[in-house]
């Protein structure tokens, strides 16, 4: 009877082990936010013209300053960006990032065709 109990316990343990991924064994699975929740963009168009862009950045996430793109502005016109905080990235090297929020003012009157691009990452390792 004792041998049968040990045999069944070993079988159950091996089934549990077989169902575990070798890459996550003993680790807690990380849940990542969808991109629109990690980096929420709000656009305001003041009466005076131009636009105010505000990204709300979720805790544990950041945007790269160097990966922001503003297409559709008049030639030679670039928005003035806050300096950001220094960050060393293993792929991009020394960079600047934004955490919590980013506000960018576009002074040009006609921004109806503005196209935006950005890249950000989670501290836990997923990049968008």
Per-region residue spans from a language model:
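Structural recognition of alpha-helix starts/caps
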Residues: 2, 17-128
